Amino acid sequence: MDNKKFLDFLKQNRIEPKNLSIYLEALTHKSYANEHKLTKNYQRLEFLGDACVEWVISNFIFNYKIKDNEKMRSLDEGEMTRARSNMVRSEILSYAAKDLGLTDFLMIGVGLEQDQSARMEKIYEDIFEAFIGAVAQDQGIKKVSLILEKTLIKYFREGQINYQKDYKTIFQEQAQRINKKPIMYKLVRNEGDKKEVHLVWNDLIYGIGIASTRKEAEILAAKNAILKLDDYTKKA
């Protein structure tokens, strides 16, 4: 790792490290640790970061207000649960790691360097949580909140994540009001970081999703399918 670039990265995120080694630990995969005979990897910090993310996001959601019938109100328990679940999904945390630029500093074993499978997406999720754990240990929970404001909370405010039911559930409920035919998510392309999924219902392709993970592609396919289903019901 280029320590100067990493220090610049921390500075861009308003972090003046008291203990640089804890951040390096947060970015060290066990394969790299094994190859270089290091005693530490990111797993313990990932455990801590997971708890920190949950607390900060739960606190944000608890205080979040929405406009409902011209009045502002808090989210109810079900909405809070869905919002938190949507905000900490694996693909969201993985995306946040890439968006923040953490993946540029990941230290990983030689055997995994060329791996473009879903396993890497899981590793990106892990280092995001581990980095949050490192920030919590070195800087405190307020700085963690600032990092999450730039990522997960920003995605929520911009509408990329919502507190309502996920797209797959919405499509399933709407489709089953019409008939009970099965909904299938077919993986039709699996090329490195490009997964293409077709949502098939009523013997028709209702939605297509392309993303870096199959799960995310299924969600996009369901989102597109909802629009097509709306047209179907309007014409019916």
From Swiss-Prot:
The keyword Iron-sulfur does not apply. InterPro entries: dsRBD_dom, RNase_III, RNase_III_dom, RNase_III_sf. It comes from the Bacteria. Its cofactor is Mg(2+). Mg(2+) binds at E46, D126, E129. Pfam families: dsrm, Ribonucleas_3_3. Residues 166-231 form the DRBM domain. It is found in: Cytoplasm. PROSITE patterns: DS_RBD (PS50137), RNASE_3_1 (PS00517), RNASE_3_2 (PS50142). Residues 6-140 form the RNase III domain. GO terms for cellular component: cytoplasm. The keyword rRNA processing applies. Its EC number is 3.1.26.3. The active site is at D50, E129. Its main location: cytoplasm. GO terms for biological process: mRNA processing; regulation of gene expression; rRNA processing; tRNA processing. It catalyses: Endonucleolytic cleavage to 5'-phosphomonoester. It is an enzyme of class 3 (hydrolase). Keywords: Cytoplasm, Endonuclease, Hydrolase, Magnesium, Metal-binding, mRNA processing, Nuclease, RNA-binding, rRNA processing, rRNA-binding, tRNA processing. NCBIfam families: RNaseIII. Belongs to the ribonuclease III family. Digests double-stranded RNA. Involved in the processing of primary rRNA transcript to yield the immediate precursors to the large and small rRNAs (23S and 16S). Processes some mRNAs, and tRNAs when they are encoded in the rRNA operon. Processes pre-crRNA and tracrRNA of type II CRISPR loci if present in the organism. PANTHER family: RIBONUCLEASE 3, RIBONUCLEASE III. Homodimer. This is Ribonuclease 3. It comes from Ureaplasma parvum serovar 3 (strain ATCC 700970). The gene is rnc.
